[in-house]
Amino acid sequence: MIPAPAIPVQDEAPQEGPPEDGGDAAPESPLSEPAAPSEPTAEARLREREDLDLLFAELAQPGGETWARAETDILRIWSRSGSAAMDLLYKRGEAALDAGDTVTALGHLTALTDHAPDFASGWYLRSVAFYLDGDLGPAIADLGEVLRLEPRHFGALTQLGTMLEELGDDRNALEAFRQSLKIHPHQQEAQDAVRRLEQKLQGTDA
């Protein structure tokens, strides 16, 4: 995961203990949170990238039973921004989505993408929020940011295919699903979509 850029913090000493979850309250400025730990070193980022390469190689294997663990490890790495304050915004946005509160989720996640524009998972989660809010244009734009930062983000490719299919762009939707399956061939949703779209487009190619 590309770490979030360092952000200035207030001079006040951080409070003891973890910050309380804001629930469905209005998003708070990340600058009011306790100072984030120092960013990962270049060596740590390189090691993380090497770990991801190994996990993606394992994920791409069509057989075997270890792909699920590889998927879990990839998602865990992607969920870390490198900043405690940004991670808190991410968790608050995620909690709001789980509660069905897309307005609050978008508030938290917009603050996250503003302060940590290199954190791909922030863009991805905001894309999901836009999609659930019925706003496909911004949702697709956010997926573009995700794929710019992490071209192997299979979740973003599958989500892009879903949105394009809803918009009637079946050919590009099919291509997005196919690209996603090249990275993660075990996604049932993408497999079903490829079969459905190939059958639908078969007649138009005749």
Question: Could you tell me what each predicted segment is?
Answer:
Residues 1-87:
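N-terminal leader/linker segments that initiate helical-solenoid repeat arrays
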Residues 56-57, 72, 110, 144, ...:
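Alpha-solenoid helical repeat scaffolds
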Residues 64, 79-86, 141, 170-175, ...:
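Alpha-helical linker/edge segments of TPR/alpha-solenoid repeat scaffolds
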Residues 64-67, 102, 136, 170:
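TPR-repeat structural position
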Residues 83-156:
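Alpha-helical adaptor scaffolds
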Residues 98, 132, 166-167, 196-203:
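Register position in tetratricopeptide repeats
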Residues 126-127, 133, 160, 167, ...:
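Residue-level signature of tetratricopeptide-repeat
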Residues 175, 181-206:
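Terminal, low-structured helical/coil segments at or just beyond the last alpha-helical repeat
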